[in-house]
From Swiss-Prot:
Protein's recorded name: Enolase
Binding-site positions, Mg(2+) 2: D253, E304, D331
Source organism (scientific name): Plasmodium falciparum
SMART domains cross-referenced by the UniProt entry: Enolase_C, Enolase_N
Gene Ontology molecular function, alphabetical: magnesium ion binding; phosphopyruvate hydratase activity; protein homodimerization activity
Amino acid sequence: MAHVITRINAREILDSRGNPTVEVDLETNLGIFRAAVPSGASTGIYEALELRDNDKSRYLGKGVQKAIKNINEIIAPKLIGMNCTEQKKIDNLMVEELDGSKNEWGWSKSKLGANAILAISMAVCRAGAAPNKVSLYKYLAQLAGKKSDQMVLPVPCLNVINGGSHAGNKLSFQEFMIVPVGAPSFKEALRYGAEVYHTLKSEIKKKYGIDATNVGDEGGFAPNILNANEALDLLVTAIKSAGYEGKVKIAMDVAASEFYNSENKTYDLDFKTPNNDKSLVKTGAQLVDLYIDLVKKYPIVSIEDPFDQDDWENYAKLTAAIGKDVQIVGDDLLVTNPTRITKALEKNACNALLLKVNQIGSITEAIEACLLSQKNNWGVMVSHRSGETEDVFIADLVVALRTGQIKTGAPCRSERNAKYNQLLRIEESLGNNAVFAGEKFRLQLN
């Protein structure tokens, strides 16, 4: 029996920052399947287009009624009657035929909006799992051609100190994460992370006052820290005090495009101070040296977006210098785009992909980006966005793709913990068929 799509309805809901986003209900004979898409704060210029209304009289221009209209009036009529198990066919129809917009890096989704296409793509995945009588993670594994007998549970990279565009402090680097690689299971890794998080909260309260323990968009703290060393010292102290020295490592997301000056090709580490004295302006080469020094001094295992999204040269220099011991992750550099990944492979620019489904705009293309990266022995980290919803799709996706690592915020705020809690459920349901990535989070666990 064919399980066809009988109805699609899109609506505008609020994300975790109070901004509108797209949610879709997709109906088949087996029920109603729902999906909601996230949105980012520090977005790469090469990401697929997130369609906003730009009507300043409504939600300050951030409404998504255009995307909703595109779903209900353009996409839905074409998908009614299609088999919900034909994921690739449906995604290709939306991306290539109904939208059809392109730029130098591929399909740009600038006509219908990546937020419109992705919401349906995710809902179709959920609907497609139902007739197969399998969980979403097992169905996604099938779509990716991955084995689904033994599944890999990821190491959580928990964002506990915020800077950059995510925070009102002076800190230029955007995220400082704790990575519990020494835990025996996901459940224990989450416990290690939560305990370090609460220990860190006490340390921050003691040193910076109670106001400094307010949390940011992703649940992390944003005390008035001035530089990376200060943040890293805090983390090392918290890890040690919690009793997890050696078992919990550190990852950073620098988001360097946010403080890059393209005119003189420099990086301003004091970019949040207006009219500063330029004493913290660095060249790409100086920034390479800074990262090398930090890696020598602290237990850092991963650095994301260490340079601007077009600074291929310094990416390659850093990867050559420390890539054997440290994961160099491309986010704004790659934007989950297979064409950008191919260029990075040619230039040896980095050795890991940050996988964000809404950067590329369809599940088929996201899987393609992951498989291309894994084929070339890169690490892959599945990621949330700073504007999230209660949708837990990425928790199933990370298990399905066997990437061994996920970042979806601090162990705080329900839209973040929703993903971690779903991973707890998946690990429990798999029983002995669950393998925790642990120290091997960068390796191919295929």
